[in-house]
Amino acid sequence: MRTTQYLLATIKEIPKSCEPISHQLMLRSGMVRQISSGVYTWLPTGLRVLKKIENIIHEEMNKIGFLEIFMPITQPANLWKQSGRWSEYGLELLRFKNRTNQKFVLGPTHEEMITDLVCNEILSHKQFPIKLYQINTKYRDEARPQFGVIRSKEFIMKDGYSFHIHQKSLEDTYYNIYQQYHIIFKRIGLKFCVVQADPGNIGGIVSHEFQAYYNNTQNETAIFTETFNKDMSNINTRKNNDIVINNIHILNTIQTIKLTSADFHNLIIMRLINYYKSFIQETIKNIIIYIKNKNNIYNLHRIATQAYEKFNDLKLVKIPDIIIPISILNKKNIEIKLNLLKLINTPVPLMINYNVATAMYDFIFHNININKNYCMKINQTPNLSKITTNLYESNIKKINTNQIRKLLPIRNTIEIGHIFQLGKKYSNCINSCIQKKNKDNLNITMGCYGIGITRIVPMVIEQHHDKHGIIWPNEIAPFKLAIIPINMYRFINVQNTAEELYTQLSSIPVIGFDILLDDRKENPGIMFTDIDLLGIPHILIISERNLNNQEVEYKYRKTGIIQKIKLNLIIQFLTEKLMNN
């Protein structure tokens, strides 16, 4: 591509109120232009980056057997009413009527559409599992769009869906997606972490978020070194899977500490860990709660969870027979029952978080329902030694949050991907459809897997930039190589060399047409500034002085290092450089 035939669209100045840095650089480098609040046009440079990200996603999704489809953004309202999300979704769901007064929505997601499609197309259980995905535009009527395309009203997503007649099949696909997302984000060049998450209004039981590190967000994530067990058990907090919990220290949080006093609670745990010279990964806390069941009977329950985890009643209510509200008991409320806390195997029902249950493989647990990922109901537990109960220090008044942060590294993050095991939330209609067609009585479960493609672009910029502009990872750069001929219209040998190299390099598969030849009649300073701003990884500089020595200059954008290469070796040099990157 020649700059004289390209819409470069770089600008020097942008509004001072424009933030964050990724949005500034996307405007300055001519990637996007704002049309209205939360709505953007993608210019050629930005679109080239988007397409390369999409190509990576296509390749990796195809490797695990997902088939691409394309569904309309306009969706009939009756599908959303059937799923119950017509009223649940809120004002972000843009509703409208057509000329015949039929109700529609602009789809923020496509669960309803895909289940309707599968319901009408699938005839037999022999066609399962079904794995489909699309890359498509979504629309959410955000109240406060901000940070450029990071939080916009119109955006591009990859959303995948899988349908299964066996739970194990769903879990295997979920695991494959989990692994493939790691490959996708690493190829793109993102630094990220994975956290267990609440499914929110999408629904389901099991859910993981992929979070990119991003300094300009208020969302904080405690970071652990992660591995993922295929049996859907947990994300461990060490580099290997050999977590051995020799001593189980139970911290009963029955004191009158409010739920908002997270720092106070964590400080107590920290002192417990220091006292026993243990690790936070090896510490379990025991929370006493008061729960009403479906028979309106109130009972005491205990939750055994790892010390670093926060109590989340949204996860707890997913267990059958439990009804909100859930109350954490204070010391006064439970004084008469205090003797029940001295051993873990007491008459008080114990619900063990899945992370704890799977980590404690030295012990035998009975009646664990492995389909419930967040909390496990068990009827019996073994006797455990060295149990500490009711550790409570009421004289602690000042909280040093820095001490807690040393135990749990905190990073600012933003969501770039989300995967769900939806269960039967959307697939019941498919069961009934197939049963009507051929009387197959199936138990279909569903998975959903999303990636925010337009959000990835600014996230990469946030992690890869300097004072001169963007520094694109090689695989998603708008161009892999830039050729800057200095005063090419003044020196004929500079022009001829630039044209010859442009032609030769374009024929090499590893480079192809990913070359930008800056053939403008511009001051060299402007050319260097624009190419650095665009973030093209590899830069070739051709000048009259260097050609006199049969040399050209090569600049690596990431480091800024310039080296001179013999003209007769430059093709081989660039080919090897690009293949290694």
UniProtKB/Swiss-Prot annotation:
Protein name stated in the entry: Proline--tRNA ligase
GO biological process: prolyl-tRNA aminoacylation
Family: Belongs to the class-II aminoacyl-tRNA synthetase family. ProS type 1 subfamily.
GO terms for MF: ATP binding; proline-tRNA ligase activity
UniProt remark on domains: Consists of three domains: the N-terminal catalytic domain, the editing domain and the C-terminal anticodon-binding domain.
Keyword Protein biosynthesis: yes
Gene that produces this protein: proS
Catalytic activity: tRNA(Pro) + L-proline + ATP = L-prolyl-tRNA(Pro) + AMP + diphosphate
CDD domains: ProRS_anticodon_short, ProRS_core_prok
Entry keyword Aminoacyl-tRNA synthetase: yes
